[in-house]
Amino acid sequence: MSKDKLWGGRFTQPTDKFVEEFTASINFDKRLYHQDIRGSIAHATMLGKQGIIPVADVESIVSGLKTILEQIEAGEFDFSVSLEDIHMNIEARLSEKIGDAGKRLHTGRSRNDQVALDIRLYLRDELVEVSAYIDLLIDAIIHQAEENLGVIMPGFTHLQTAQPILFSHHMMAYHEMLKRDKARMEDCLKRTNVLPLGAGALAGTTFPIDREYVAELLDFDGVTRNSLDSVSDRDFAMEFCAASSILMVHLSRFSEELILWSTSEFKFVELSDSFCTGSSIMPQKKNPDVPELVRGKTGRVNGNLVALLTLMKSLPLAYNKDMQEDKEPLFDTIDTVKGCLKVFADMVREMKINPERMKTAAAAGFSTATDVADYLVRKGIPFRDAHEIVGKTVRYCIENEMDIPELSLAEWQLFSGRIEEDIFESITLQASVNARRATGGTALERVRAEIARAKEGR
């Protein structure tokens, strides 16, 4: 018999010491202790209810598991690599404490459905937490949008000045992205919150278990419908990592803008000293380390998704030892996403903006050129012809080192006789912004309404 192994009856030689260390997962799956114990208590309770094991044994099992939980949380539990994983560590300790009753706990289940349960329980709780952290960032964004309503900045395409927009409109763009990110987390929760326990190793169990009762005890919405699928797939974990990658891409784009905007060349925003660091050699430096790290950690989260996808891509049904490698990418993604969301929310809430600098930048780069084209369209000129006229006007301005607002009426009329005195009312920054009143536009009235709508939906 392989010494000290709960599965060792079939073996005549002990496990190689290095193999034991190589195959053990306790160093990282021990974080599932609470879920493992909770699942075992529910399983034991069901076994007693169904008359599969004596009620007295159930009482001993539940009491023993609660004691083990207290020991783990007090730091008094010694995890053993020789026992491989969190399941075997807890079960072995339970049997030491209560004897044969502990050996009955595993009746009607396998580690295959047990670990699937633990991961689902763990991810279910974390999905709720991640959604709460998203809400914190959404609140910070709404705060900035509301506090700075009316501030005009340049909108960019290709990182070139395009059209003037409200800073609040820009902030609310990230609000929309984060709303979708939260919705993806909530959708993932629906598919995660189903009970796999009862699937056994792959084919189910011969015991008259009550899976629906266990699902009720553990607050699951239902049970999985195919035992093979229950232990074979980790698509719920992949879905979470995919949603997290999209979320992190949004944070990375936001980070990139804050990094740019905080440079001396832009000076649109100033990040709080609390979220920046200095240089070891250049005393004048104030480095935006937090957004840079968030941008960098996006690659880490994306890598975790690829790791999970690659892990699962060629596995035959049902369980394979490869699947032990699912936990570290999942755990790391959870930790990274929560940390990034928390620090980002605090940073956004505390950042200061520079309205004058934004307005000055918005006025440069011929940002109201499209408004001139729209003006000409309203005068009866087809848009493509209007586009050509404004393009020639811009070239004239470049050649004469001037901007659109500096043109006189006479100069305007060199390009079109339909241009009149009212052109000057159409090319101010305020007029440009407020003219975009359609749903989703940057007009003040629209942005104010979207902020109010966002606050109601929190």
Swiss-Prot record:
Question: What reaction gets catalysed by this protein?
Answer: 2-(N(omega)-L-arginino)succinate = fumarate + L-arginine
Q: What is its EC number?
A: 4.3.2.1
Q: What class of enzyme is it?
A: lyase
Mention one GO molecular function: argininosuccinate lyase activity
Which InterPro entries does the entry mention?
Arg_succ_lyase_C, Argininosuccinate_lyase, Fumarase/histidase_N, Fumarate_lyase_CS, Fumarate_lyase_fam, Fumarate_lyase_N, L-Aspartase-like
An example GO CC term for this entry is: cytosol
Q: Is-annotated flag, keyword Lyase?
A: yes
Q: What is its main location?
A: cytoplasm
Subcellular location(s) of the protein: Cytoplasm
Pathway stated in the Swiss-Prot or TrEMBL entry: Amino-acid biosynthesis; L-arginine biosynthesis; L-arginine from L-ornithine and carbamoyl phosphate: step 3/3
* GO terms for biological process, alphabetical: arginine biosynthetic process via ornithine; L-arginine biosynthetic process
Keywords annotated in UniProt: Amino-acid biosynthesis, Arginine biosynthesis, Cytoplasm, Lyase
The answer to whether the entry has keyword Transmembrane helix is no
HAMAP family in alphabetical order: Arg_succ_lyase
Name the family the entry cites.
Belongs to the lyase 1 family. Argininosuccinate lyase subfamily.
- Know the name of this protein? Argininosuccinate lyase
